[in-house]
């Protein structure tokens, strides 16, 4: 007895108008994640995953390319407005925001959510070059 083929239902992309761009800019890499208002990730990209390795990964240009790739991935969701949350002291902070703005998103709010300790852990020693 032949089984009837099971057809997979086509996934319908949900339409999201407002989103949140989480930018994690460390000294070594930049991670861009775009989520909806509830925090469900729509797309993400990193400077390292965009083809930059080693010290080139920690450049503003690498962060810009990562933001452009992430913006391209969320175009299919119909995203228009972005709220930006920046975390970390890295070199890709500004260039990422500029790239998202140039990609056609309306940036409504920019928030710095860098965790600042109330005298918690001892920081790493200063570099002597």
Curated annotation (Swiss-Prot):
What Pfam families does UniProt report for this protein, alphabetically?
Ribosomal_S11 (PF00411)
UniProt KW keywords: Ribonucleoprotein, Ribosomal protein, RNA-binding, rRNA-binding
Extract one GO BP annotation from the record. translation
Cross-referenced InterPro entries: Ribosomal_uS11, Ribosomal_uS11_bac-type, Ribosomal_uS11_CS, Ribosomal_uS11_sf
Gene Ontology terms: cellular component:
ribonucleoprotein complex; ribosome
> Can the keyword Ribonucleoprotein be found in this entry's annotation?
yes
Q: Name one GO molecular function term.
A: structural constituent of ribosome
Q: Which domain of life is it from?
A: Bacteria
Specify whether Ribosomal protein is a keyword of the entry. Answer: yes
Record-linked NCBIfam families? PRK05309.1, uS11_bact
Q: Which family does it belong to?
A: Belongs to the universal ribosomal protein uS11 family.
Q: Describe its partners and assembly state.
A: Part of the 30S ribosomal subunit. Interacts with proteins S7 and S18. Binds to IF-3.
- Summary of the function given for this chain in its UniProt record: Located on the platform of the 30S subunit, it bridges several disparate RNA helices of the 16S rRNA. Forms part of the Shine-Dalgarno cleft in the 70S ribosome.
What name is this protein filed under? Small ribosomal subunit protein uS11
Q: What organism, scientifically named, is this protein from?
A: Mannheimia succiniciproducens (strain KCTC 0769BP / MBEL55E)
């Amino acid at each position: 007895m032949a089984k009837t083929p099971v057809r997979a239902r086509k996934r319908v992309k949900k339409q999201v108008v407002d989103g949140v761009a989480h930018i994690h800019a460390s000294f070594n890499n930049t991670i861009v994640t775009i989520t909806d208002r509830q925090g469900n990730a729509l797309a993400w990209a990193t400077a390292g995953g965009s083809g930059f390795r080693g010290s080139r990964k920690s450049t503003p240009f690498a962060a810009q390319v990562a933001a452009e790739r992430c913006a391209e991935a969320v175009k299919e969701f119909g995203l228009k407005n972005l709220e930006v949350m920046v975390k970390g002291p890295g070199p890709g902070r500004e260039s990422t925001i500029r790239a998202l703005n140039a990609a056609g998103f309306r940036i409504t709010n920019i928030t710095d959510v860098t965790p600042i300790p109330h005298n918690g852990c001892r920081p790493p020693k200063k570099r002597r070059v």
